[in-house]
């Protein structure tokens, strides 16, 4: 598989010689008014759908993953034995796990954020220091949500709070 050419976020796990990148969208979409963007059928075709795991030292891609829906921020677990990260998708409102198992990297969708039909648009994510919870702030509905990720393969929403009309 080939990466789609968009770059957005990057995280590194130096202990695993890995760098991970997401592919939200290109500059033109990023700078466009959101209302105009959502109504522009051509612009809506210009979103990324890949996450790339790179060799950190050589800066060469090791594996390209299909992560449909425009992956945004990447956050990695803090624990020294926790070789996994999360990303969320802007257009499909999914939580994706990027994880290492038996020295191979994999991805899987592990949770849904709000009502995807309403495009909540997750814009900020954070993992708690104990790697047990993932905070997700969503732009379009002004919500903050907390997911229990003590089992990273099964994110469960445990808290929701309205912050405002838009975050």
PLM features: residue spans?
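Asp-box/WD-like beta-propeller blade repeats and closely related beta-sheet repeat scaffolds
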Residues: 1-14
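Surface-exposed loop and turn segments in beta-propeller and other repeat-based domains
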Residues: 2-3, 61-70, 106-120, 159-167
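Conserved beta-strand position repeated once per blade in WD40 beta-propeller domains
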Residues: 9, 73-76, 124
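Short coil/turn segments that connect the beta-strands within blades of beta-propeller domains
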Residues: 15-17, 81-83, 130-132
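Short, conserved, GDST-rich strand-edge loop motifs in beta-rich repeat architectures
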Residues: 21-46
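Short loop/turn segments immediately following the C-termini of beta-strands
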Residues: 24, 88-91, 139
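Short loop/turn segments that connect beta-strands within beta-propeller blades
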Residues: 56-59, 100-103, 149-152
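Loop/turn-rich, solvent-exposed surfaces of beta-rich toroidal or solenoidal domains
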Residues: 93, 118-167
